[in-house]
Amino acid sequence: MNDSSVIYRAIVTSKFRTEKMLNFYNSIGSGPDKNTIFITFGRSEPWSSNENEVGFAPPYPTDSVLGVTDMWTHMMGTVKVLPSMLDAVIPRRDWGDTRYPDPYTFRINDIVVCNSAPYNATESGAGWLVYRCLDVPDTGMCSIASLTDKDECLKLGGKWTPSARSMTPPEGRGDAEGTIEPGDGYVWEYLFEIPPDVSINRCTNEYIVVPWPEELKEDPTRWGYEDNLTWQQDDFGLIYRVKANTIRFKAYLDSVYFPEAALPGNKGFRQISIITNPLEAKAHPNDPNVKAEKDYYDPEDLMRHSGEMIYMENRPPIIMAMDQTEEINILFTF
């Protein structure tokens, strides 16, 4: 009997997760071959008499028939998520932002934003400039405690944290090889530019937007991508280069469409869910199925339990006013 074994190591690459995200995005839209997504809100009844106290936590939603039934029973309205309200996002980290730890120390493959504040301004009149760290100084420490050499650390799968700080923010769009070397031991790669209107309307303190391939193809100059170096034509897969795998859903709950939920003295709402491909309510059971494609629906205008509920959330109350529009953002990581 042969007791020897073969040791191998394998991974599923980041492109698998990015591809799943892109396929999901491309499946959303109007028409028989596309999926529709709706964000629902509901439950005006308080969780308990002390739900407004500090530290109160609502019950966990349950992924069961009873849990889905509870969401439908307490539903107050639904809002369609348009494809334009879906963004690929990655975590935001600004060079030199002292609100966060180690604002001048970076690791290989860190993605960093510049030109977003006076302390990292490099190009007047441009939007936010996004870079990737390609190399760091040799002095530092490895996540594998027994290793002290940077190259050996990286070859064995460790993470190298340099002890030297980045002295100046990366600047420019790169040389013929696309790299930027400020002279402090750090080497950077220019990725893309976030236009001013996008940084204001679609980016947050936590996340920056990465353009979808068709958005980038439509106007490369807008995203600072007109001089992108690539081995193939029409290569606009920036989401693969930055390993994006998180998609943000955005919807607006407008009191104009749901006035009953915003009347004076209303008790707010406490549940949110996401439903794919719900059907409109039928006048007769034998009527043909009609996929819901309007922008807004009241619960009675949808067929109860139709579609698939892919997200459930119980939360503290949100109280709406008559002139209020509530913005809801939900992140899915693939």
From Swiss-Prot:
Keywords: Disulfide bond, Viral baseplate protein, Viral release from host cell, Viral tail assembly, Viral tail protein, Virion. Belongs to the tevenvirinae baseplate structural protein gp8 family. It comes from Enterobacteria phage T4 (Bacteriophage T4). GO terms for cellular component: virus tail, baseplate. Homodimer. Interacts with gp7. Part of the baseplate macromolecular complex which consists of gp5, gp5.4, gp27 (central spike complex); gp6, gp25, gp53 (inner baseplate); gp7, gp8 (intermediate baseplate); gp9, gp10, gp11, gp12 (peripheral); gp48 and gp54 (proximal region of the tail tube). It is found in: Virion. The gene is 8. Intermediate baseplate protein. Involved in the tail assembly. One of its GO terms (biological process) is viral tail assembly. The keyword Zinc-finger does not apply. Transmembrane segments: none annotated. Disulfide bonds join 142-153. InterPro entries: Gp8_sf (IPR036327), Phage_T4_Gp8 (IPR015298). Induction: Expressed in the late phase of the viral replicative cycle. Coiled coil: none annotated. This is Baseplate wedge protein gp8. It comes from the Viruses.
